[in-house]
Design a protein with these regions (language model features):
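Extracytoplasmic
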Residues: 43-45, 59-61, 67-69, 79, ...
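N-terminal signal peptide c-region/cleavage motif recognized by signal peptidases
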Residues: 20-24
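An acidic-aromatic
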Residues: 63-115, 180-183
Length: 209
């Protein structure tokens, strides 16, 4: 299945050629970057529907659940025997079809930008042009650690969202240049999410983790 190959996207110019950016534009970019960090940090819990698409055009949906600090769950739609979940320390990919479990430190995944925005977005983020005042796009890349991949977070300005920006999608590019795009809808914030929502049934044993 193609999405097994693209999981790493979720879980793992020379100065002379650079464009000259005006001081007001730099100030606006700094404000947007700070707003994005504030918006992500303001999300205590969130649930949303998601659509995940890869470069081959394959799409699959499901429900995303997030809880700070560091917990996230991608529950795929019925018929997709996979699960992505973080318990706050490691990101786990569970493939129930082949009874396999893989784990990564969350900081080694592009998703670390979602779960630790102060460290990743604030330090490594840069504002990208969008052509719309309503859209803010932040590319997060640690150039010293290319194996961590790149994630581009896209926000829509919305007064009712935490921090005034609603996370609407992101594109993750892993170190093998595999790209995955995740689009969110029906976002709900501040909902009750128990910690056991981030446990999973280990297909290798009868033990629930």
């Amino acid at each position: 299945m193609t999405f097994r190959m693209t999981f790493g996207s979720l879980a793992s110019a020379a100065a002379s050629a650079a464009l000259v950016v005006s001081a007001p534009a730099q100030a606006d970019d700094a404000a947007d970057l700070a707003s994005a960090v504030t918006a992500l940090r303001a999300i205590t819990t969130m649930r949303a529907d998601f659509i995940q698409a890869d470069t081959r055009g394959q799409r699959v949906g499901g429900v995303l659940t997030l809880k700070r600090p560091g917990k996230i769950r991608f529950q795929y739609e019925k018929g997709v025997p996979m699960l992505i979940v973080s318990d706050g320390s490691a990101l786990t990919f569970v493939d129930y079809e082949v009874r396999q479990v893989q784990r990564w430190p969350i900081k080694n995944s592009p998703l670390g930008a979602l779960l630790d925005p102060n460290r990743d977005v604030g330090k490594y983020g840069r504002v990208m042009p969008t052509g719309s005042d309503r859209i803010v796009s932040i590319e997060v890349r640690d150039r010293a650690r290319p194996e961590y991949g790149v994630i581009t977070l896209v926000f829509t300005r919305k007064a009712s969202a935490p921090g005034g920006l609603e996370l609407s999608s992101w594109a993750a590019l892993d170190s093998q240049k595999r790209r995955t795009i995740v689009s969110l809808s029906n976002q709900q914030y501040g909902i009750d999410v128990p910690d056991n929502a981030f446990r999973y049934n280990d297909p290798r044993s009868p033990v629930r983790r």
